[in-house]
Every structure is written in C-alpha cells, then in structure tokens.
C-alpha cells in the first residue's frame, strides 16, 4: 500500500473489489497511470464465495489464473440444485470438458486481497483506508467528472484530479446513486439474505468428481432458497435467501412466540427453522456440524442502472447492477464490467472510436450480461415459488437435467466468456427462458403469482418500441465472447498492449 495519494493521475478507480482491481490491473498492463482508492484496509470480509468457470479466462488475461490454482482454494467442479423434494437434484458440471474448467469456492477476504495485490504488482498505485467524499465535475461539461475529494481516518484529506474515472464502489454506487440517480430496483427480487459459518459439516458427493460442489435448495414452503458452500479454511458457508415480506412475516411470528428472546436470538431461530425447510442441506450438514461465530444478514435487492457510462467515466460491478446470487454470478459480472470498462477507456484514449461510441458499448455490454442472468434467475424463482408446477421440467421428468443443460451457457457464464459457445446454443437458452417466463393458462393458476420484473429492465439501442419492451431482444444477436461479441458495431480487441475496440 502506498502512502500519499497523488495530486493527479490518468485513470482513477474507486473500489478495490473484483471489478475495481480487475479494471485497474488491465489498464495498468496497457501502460496507463492508474490510481485505485479503497475505503477499507484489505483483507476485509465480504460475502459472495462461489465463482463460475467463466472467470478463468478473465483471470488468465492478467496472468492471475496460476495464482488461483496454486493458492489452495477448493476447486468448484459444478453446482447441485434441488428445486423440488420429489425430484432428484440437478447438476451443472463445470468439468465436463476437462478439470481445468472448474471454478473455485473462495474466502472472499483472501481472494479480493490476492487480486488487489496482483493489480499493485502490475503497476496500479493502491491506496487503502481512503474514503471518497465528493466528486467534482467539469465546469465546461457538467456530466464529466474531473477530480474528487478524499479523506482518511487519521484526519488527512485532499483532492486528486484525473482524466478517466472507473466507479467500482460496490453497492454504494457513488456515481449511480449520488450523482446520476439512475438506480432501479427489481420489484420481484427484493430479498433478504441471512447466513453464517459452520464447522464439521459434510460434503456433497464425497469421493466423487462432484465433491466440494456447492448445494442450492428451494425451501419446502416456497418462500426462498438456501445455500451450502464448502470453503478451504474448514468452514462451510450456509445461508438462506427469502423474499423480504416473507422474512418480515416469519420474524414477526417467531417474535410473538419467543417468550422475551432478544432480536438476535429470534433471528437465529428463524434461520434454523428455515434450514429445516431444506432437508437436503440438513443432511449435508450432518449431526457433527457446529454453528460458529455470529449470524449475518443483508438486504439482497436486485437492481440495475439506466446507463453504466458517460463522458470519461465507467461504472462496473455492484456499483451499477446486482442480481440475486442464486447462480453465483457476482464475481463474473464484476470481471465482465471491469474488462469492458478498461477496454472502452483504452479504445477512447487510442482513438479506436468516439467516446460516445465507447460509452454505448460499455452500457450495452453490462446490461446484456446482467439481463442474461436476470431472466434465468426469474425462471428459477418461478419454480421455487410454485414447486408442484412444471415450470422447469416436463410432467413425466423426475429431474431438472434438461432445464439445467438448456441454461448452461448462462449459469456457467459461457455466454460472456466462452469462445467455443455457438450462437445456436445461446439462442436455445434464450428461447428456453422465453418459454418459462411467457404467460400461459397454467401459469395463471399458480398459487403464488410471480412478477417477472421485465418492465424493470430497459432494453436500449432497440430498433422499435416493440423490441424495446422485450429485454431479451438485445441478446438475440450476441456472438460468443469478449473477443468476438459484436455490440453496436464494435468488438473488443483482446491483445495486451493494443486493448481497445475494433469496428466490425
């Protein structure tokens, strides 16, 4: 960590999480002067411990993959999904094409610190314990940020000017919430997460190639789902995600029956009661498992922004959008946004395109990646909230294998990172999502109606009003990955020293 924040830099990155560290690392490798400000001092705790295999090519691009392989994190060979107690769990196999396609279950404090230190090794000037107080904009161009005021816990403060800004400030989303005011929450995914850590837990499929895969299970009362993620430090992350109104209802019920228990005790009772509604998870915990530490909770609201870029700034990661964690998409979307931010800034600096074209590319790229996961998650929630209805399976099927295979390009992150994914495979996934979310007579009879939230997602750059009403429209013509996916007539040139955009 460097001592004194400089007075100026080429590129200023706010936030040292995966989106910020990655964008900074990519830009530093391109020879730009990059300063990164992080309000915490790493390592620091963070939830979001499961990765997708699509992260590997991103990490490989900055020579970070080998560090991950050698660090000791548990390899994640796939993920098991139990959506109905009467049917066998589904499984998405990351290693079907070889063991090197596995992802990892990570302790985020360690992973984030490792990535931030790697960025510093690549030339990023990292300053921790620095809080951004205010962003200043150009007097000649009111939407262009040109400097910011910062402060530290010891009372020191100052200003730093820059030519380009990457806002990767996490859910605080400084640009989006404080200045642009363009954040919108998805009404159907206003959830609450409660979690803690256990020791002595079992493993899913021990002794097989599926061992250490996380387990995700729908609660039997159709109010949410639970996760079970084994970690290399001997702990297992176990959490529950509930709709906000259901969480409030359950807490009120437990409080009424609590006989004077404290609020934390009531919350723990709710947590344990919900775990009992995931019998497969309880079986994995086993009789020797012990809850350690304290219970944690957080609002788990899904949100997005109307734009993720503007004159000389980009927004990446949770600073711009967040989607329900059912498919562990957080780090994937952070790296996607980080690389897009870096690529479009480099493109604008190098004259590959206009700044307006670079901004449009970045906003479309982030929106497309977010919307892919949004529609798959909405389909999963439709099944969770109506488990006896054939949403993701046919009546005669005893499993969800067909559905999971259909959704593979999205839930493994391939749609954004796999150069071998064919357009036909992606189109098949999109068609499946449409069939799940389309209204029909059977869905009208569901006990718990589900608002898809489609109206919350704005489809930009659409040729007609009809297309704009269909958030999937923007995904139909996508190619395969960063290096070949054409957006608004451009694709990314993935070559170190020449990173930027190329006109298709």
Swiss-Prot record:
Melleolide sesquiterpene aryl esters are cytotoxic secondary products with anti-cancer potential. Armillaridin shows therapeutic and radiosensitizing effects on human esophageal cancer cells. Armillaridin induces autophagy-associated cell death in human chronic myelogenous leukemia as well as of hepatocellular carcinoma cells. Armillaridin can also inhibit the differentiation and activation of human macrophages and thus might have potential to be developed as a biological response modifier for inflammatory diseases. FAD binds at residues 16, 19, 49, 149, 331. The lineage of its organism: Eukaryota, Fungi, Dikarya, Basidiomycota, Agaricomycotina. Belongs to the flavin-dependent halogenase family. Its EC number is 1.14.19.-. GO terms for biological process: secondary metabolite biosynthetic process. This is Flavin-dependent halogenase armH3. It catalyses: melleolide F + FADH2 + chloride + O2 = 6'-chloromelleolide F + FAD + 2 H2O + H(+). Keywords: FAD, Flavoprotein, Monooxygenase, Oxidoreductase. The keyword Magnesium does not apply. Chloride binds at residues 329-330. Flavin-dependent halogenase involved in the biosynthesis of melleolides, a range of antifungal and phytotoxic polyketide derivatives composed of an orsellinic acid (OA) moiety esterified to various sesquiterpene alcohols. The halogenase catalyzes the transfer of a single chlorine atom to the melleolide backbone, resulting in a 6'-chloromelleolide product. The enzyme acts on free substrate and does not depend on carrier-protein-dependent acceptor molecules. SUPFAM superfamilies: FAD/NAD(P)-binding domain. Armillaria species are both devastating forest pathogens and some of the largest and oldest terrestrial organisms on Earth. They forage for hosts and achieve immense colony sizes via rhizomorphs, root-like multicellular structures of clonal dispersal. Residues 444-475 are annotated as: Disordered. It comes from the Eukaryota. GO terms for molecular function: flavin-dependent halogenase activity; monooxygenase activity.
């Amino acid at each position: 960590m460097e001592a004194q924040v400089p007075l100026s830099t080429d590129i200023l990155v706010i936030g040292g999480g995966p989106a910020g560290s990655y964008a900074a690392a990519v830009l530093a490798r391109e020879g730009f002067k990059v300063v990164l400000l992080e309000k915490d001092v790493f390592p620091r705790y963070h939830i979001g411990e499961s990765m997708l295999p699509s992260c590997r090519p991103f990490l490989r691009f900055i020579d970070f993959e080998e560090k991950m392989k050698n660090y000791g994190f548990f390899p994640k060979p796939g993920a098991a999904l139990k959506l109905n107690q009467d049917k066998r769990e589904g499984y998405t196999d990351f290693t079907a094409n070889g063991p090197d396609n596995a992802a990892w279950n990570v302790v985020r404090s360690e992973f984030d610190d490792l990535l931030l230190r790697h960025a510093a090794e690549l030339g990023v000037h990292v300053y921790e314990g620095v809080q951004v107080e205010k962003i200043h904009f150009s007097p000649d161009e009111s939407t262009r940020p040109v400097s910011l005021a910062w402060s530290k816990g010891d009372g020191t403060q100052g200003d730093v000017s820059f030519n380009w800004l990457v806002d990767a400030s996490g859910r605080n989303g400084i640009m989006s919430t404080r200045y642009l005011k363009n954040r919108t929450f998805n009404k159907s995914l206003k959830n609450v997460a409660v979690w803690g850590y256990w020791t002595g837990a079992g493993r899913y499929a021990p002794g097989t190639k599926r061992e250490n895969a996380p387990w995700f299970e729908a609660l039997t009362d159709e109010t949410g789902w639970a996760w079970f993620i084994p970690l290399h430090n001997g702990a297992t992350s176990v959490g529950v995600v509930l709709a906000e109104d259901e969480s409030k209802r359950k807490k009120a019920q437990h409080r009424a029956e609590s006989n004077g228990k404290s609020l934390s005790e009531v919350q723990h009772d709710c947590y344990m009661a919900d775990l009992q509604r995931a019998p497969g998870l309880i079986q994995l915990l086993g009789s020797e498992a012990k809850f350690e530490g304290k219970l944690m909770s957080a609002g788990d609201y899904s949100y997005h922004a109307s734009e993720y870029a503007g004159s000389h700034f980009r927004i990446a990661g949770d600073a711009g959008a967040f989607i329900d964690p059912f498919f562990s998409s957080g780090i994937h979307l952070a790296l996607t946004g980080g690389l897009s931010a870096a690529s479009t800034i480099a493109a604008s600096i190098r004259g590959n395109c206009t700044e307006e074209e670079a901004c449009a590319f970045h906003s479309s790229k982030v929106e497309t990646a977010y919307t892919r996961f949004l529609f798959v998650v909405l389909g999963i929630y439709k099944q969770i909230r109506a488990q006896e209805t054939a949403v993701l399976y046919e009546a005669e099927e005893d499993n969800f294998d067909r559905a999971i295979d259909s959704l593979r390009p999205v839930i493994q992150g391939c749609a954004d990172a796999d150069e071998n994914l064919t357009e036909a495979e992606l189109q098949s996934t999109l068609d499946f999502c449409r069939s799940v979310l389309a209204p029909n007579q059977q869905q009208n009879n569901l006990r718990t109606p589900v608002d898809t939230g489609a109206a919350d997602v704005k489809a930009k750059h659409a040729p007609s009003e009809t297309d704009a009403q269909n958030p999937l429209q923007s995904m139909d013509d996508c190619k395969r990955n960063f290096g070949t996916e054409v957006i608004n007539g451009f694709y990314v040139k993935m070559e170190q020293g020449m990173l930027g955009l190329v006109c298709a």
